[in-house]
Structure formats: structure tokens, C-alpha cells
Amino acid sequence: MAATTSPMASQLKSGFTTKALVVPKGISGPALRGFPSPRRHTSFTVRAIKTEKPTYQVIQPLNGDPFIGGLETPVTSSPLIAWYLSNLPAYRTAVNPLLRGVEVGLAHGFLLVGPFVKAGPLRNTEYAGAAGSLAAAGLVVILSMCLTMYGIASFKEGEPSIAPALTLTGRKKQPDQLQSADGWAKFTGGFFFGGVSGVTWACFLMYVLDLPYYFK
């Protein structure tokens, strides 16, 4: 078996080695030749450049903790907004909480009379003024009760103010007395007195003095 197959294998081997490779031809007949590639293959190595100065992260989380949320925005941190908020009665820490409550109550009571008079259920009757004034006074009473409940739930009697005693620059300041049980009680009492006074003053201007207002 081996003697008979060896001549065939040798003939096949010699045929493959001696036979010339067929060169492909184009459509017109001549052999195709390879064109030189217009691209130039270059190789380079990318290496990181070591800077002389150490880099640092420009935007960092609050206090270095990424899990702490910050509510500071360009609007809330602008000097104009800070000036406006610092002049509101609730944020004037140098003013007594009682006087702050009176000022806030006067504004609320005075402004609540008009909507109740013109949009109340008795707006088309002759009792619109009296009903609207009483409704505004009732809302002031309800708001005063809500402020009282908030003070009882948030502050403990006899404990000092929970407001911070340091500014952002580290300067010591007097804690806001409004953030205490006694200060909040004064604020609530002032709000009730100011609110009722504001309602009374608005009713007096519209219906007692009988001034030529746009609506009554």
C-alpha cells in the first residue's frame, strides 16, 4: 500500500511545486498589477506628559462630602437677593420677635380683606364688606393657631436658640431669639395682634372713612 501510494504523492507534490501560479487578468487581457498605496503608514506612541504643578479638582462637593446637597444657586447667593431677604421682618435678627410678628401680621391682615370682600360668597350683597372683613380676621386666627402648633412641636421650653452663633466667615454673632420657644411665642402673639389690627384698619379705611376707592 505504501509502495503504491508513494509515487502518486510524489507526482502530486512535484505538480504543485512546478506549476506556475496563475496571474489574474483584467477585462482587456493584460495582467493586473498592484498600484502603490497613496497612504503612508506611520506609527507613534502616546505618552502622558508629567506636569510640574499638581492638578486639583475645581468643582468639589460641600465639605468634601458628595452626599450633602447644597441649595445655593446664582440667584439665592447674589448680593441683591441677600439684601432683600435680610430686610424682610422674619430675617431681621436685631429686631425683637414681638415687633417682627406685628409687622408681618399687619401686612397679612391688611391685604387679606380685599380678596375676601370681592371674591367671597356674599360679594354681591350689602354685607360683602362685613363678611369679607370677618373672613379675613378668621383666617388670621387660623394662621395664628398654626404658628402656635409649629412652635410647640419645634422648640422646647427653656432651651436656648437653635440658630447658629457663627457667620459664614467665622465671626461670632448673637443667636436669633426667634428660633426658641419664648421668641416664637412672642412672634405668634405679635402676628395675631398685627393681623387683627390690619383687618380693622382696612375695614375702617373702606367703610368708615368712605373714601373714593376703586372697589369697596
UniProtKB/Swiss-Prot annotation:
GO terms for cellular component: chloroplast thylakoid membrane; photosystem I reaction center. Keywords: Chloroplast, Membrane, Photosynthesis, Photosystem I, Plastid, Thylakoid, Transit peptide, Transmembrane, Transmembrane helix. Residues 156-188 are lumenal. Its main location: plastid. It comes from Spinacia oleracea. The N-terminus is blocked. Belongs to the PsaL family. This is Photosystem I reaction center subunit XI, chloroplastic. The chain crosses the membrane at residues 135-155, 189-209. It is a multi-pass membrane protein. It is found in: Plastid, Chloroplast thylakoid membrane. The lineage of its organism: Eukaryota, Viridiplantae, Streptophyta, Embryophyta, Tracheophyta. The gene is PSAL. Residues 1-47 form a transit peptide. One of its GO terms (biological process) is photosynthesis. Residues 48-134, 210-216 are stromal.
